[in-house]
A protein has these predicted regions:
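Conserved Rossmann-fold SDR core element
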Residues: 122, 131-146, 193-200
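Rossmann-fold cofactor-recognition segment
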Residues: 16-32
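Catalytic Tyr-x(3-8)-Lys segment
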Residues: 158-179
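Catalytic loop of short-chain dehydrogenase/reductase
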Residues: 68-72, 76, 81, 95-133, ...
Length: 207
């Protein structure tokens, strides 16, 4: 079941995946809507949470605190609501996989908010792994990946950014969505890992 706050993203994902994929638009910032969704969904095996708006990259002096709160609303409080209402419906042997990012481990200038959110999610992952055991709880920490997370940048500037980052990495390229998907699948299948953050960054933290 694919869920997004925006119906068009749900339909786009369904078309991309094909087969018998199903989806539903749910306002993930609305606690009651999230709770109702999981009640109606019933039992399932794995919860993967990847929601996030385009990154707001500003130095602290220029940071809009309203936007900063919005980032935490979507990327932390919405996660907490999804786990709170979703975890009781997870079958035995199931798991939860959250999404963080290398901003928490290797922040750049202007990344105050993304770094704060990522660090918070990594701490939450460890705490939930203890509290929700035996449900496994892990996180994936992507590096720079070609996704709409960077759509606030001008297209030409964004492409230069991708090229510059790619040249600096040991793998000589930025990530693609399918690179990151493999990490989520691994954590869903790997039954002896919990409380872990798997970094898939092309070597970003090394350089």
């Amino acid at each position: 079941m694919i869920v997004s706050s925006k119906a068009e993203r749900v339909q786009e994902a369904i078309r991309s995946i094909g087969g018998d994929a199903r989806g539903q638009a749910v306002d993930v910032s609305d606690e009651k809507a999230v709770g109702s969704f999981f009640t109606n969904l019933g039992v399932f095996d794995h919860l993967v949470f990847t929601a996030g708006d385009s990154l707001q990259l500003h130095e602290l002096a220029e940071t809009d605190l309203k936007q900063a709160r919005r980032a935490f609303e979507l990327r932390y409080w919405s996660v907490l609501a999804a786990v709170k209402y979703g975890s009781p419906h997870i079958r035995s042997g199931g798991s939860i996989v959250l999404t963080t990012g290398i901003a928490g481990q290797r922040p750049q200038k202007g990344w105050v908010i993304p770094a704060s959110v990522c660090g918070t999610i990594e701490g939450l992952t460890r705490a939930l792994a203890i509290e929700l055991a035996p449900i496994r709880v892990n996180a994936v920490s992507p590096g720079v990946v070609r996704t709409n997370l960077w759509q606030n940048m001008d297209s030409a500037e964004r492409e230069r950014f991708y090229q510059d980052i790619g040249k600096s990495l040991p793998v000589r390229r930025v990530g693609e969505a399918h690179d990151i998907a493999q990490a989520f699948l691994f954590l869903m299948k790997e039954g002896f890992s919990t409380g872990q953050t798997v970094v898939v960054d092309g070597g970003t933290v090394l350089v």
